[in-house]
Amino acid sequence: MESTHKKKILIFIDWYRPAYLAGGPIQSVFNMVNALEKDYFFYICTSNSDIGSGNELVGITPNKWLKSSSNSEVIYLSAENRTKKTFLSILKIQEFESIYFNSLFSFKFSLLPLFLAKNLNTGSKLILAPRGMLGSGSLKLKKTKK
């Protein structure tokens, strides 16, 4: 992992580049990382597959921090490493200014790490981005599951 003097933000997101099938959320987080490159360094924790696919992303080494851009590193977690133990170790690697959760209804990449971060009392600002998931139209879909 890179050491930097910029403020550090940890992002949890189900899918990230080169995954693309989830569309907008991937692109908006990518755009945020690029727009804030002068002031922040991002650590992105994501899965090593694309939405609806059990296949690993091609050319990606899972479970290892990889340089993504001048201001970001990404860890692509395999299914067997999306565990409480792994998330705790990621949350403890260093102090983060903020921890950003890019979903509301994702157990592995929002609820579990949010619960762990809250209980660790890291001092980091916790940002939960529901991304329209609380809209009346969205709540009508798969109501029981949500």
Please place each PLM-identified region on the residue numbering.
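Glycine-rich His-Gly loop
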Residues: 14-15, 103, 132
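Short N-terminal targeting/anchoring amphipathic segment
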Residues: 88-109, 113, 123-129
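A conserved, positively charged/aromatic
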Residues: 134-146
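Short glycine-/acidic-enriched loop or helix-start segments at secondary-structure transitions
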Residues: 21, 54-55, 86, 109-112, ...
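Glycine-rich nucleotide phosphate-binding loop and flanking beta-alpha elements
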Residues: 51, 106-107, 134
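Active-site proximal beta-strand in glycosyltransferases
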Residues: 8-9, 98, 117-137
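N-terminal subdomain of nucleotide-sugar transferases
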Residues: 1-58, 64-66, 94, 122
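Glycine-rich, highly charged phosphate/nucleotide-binding loops
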Residues: 58-59, 74-88
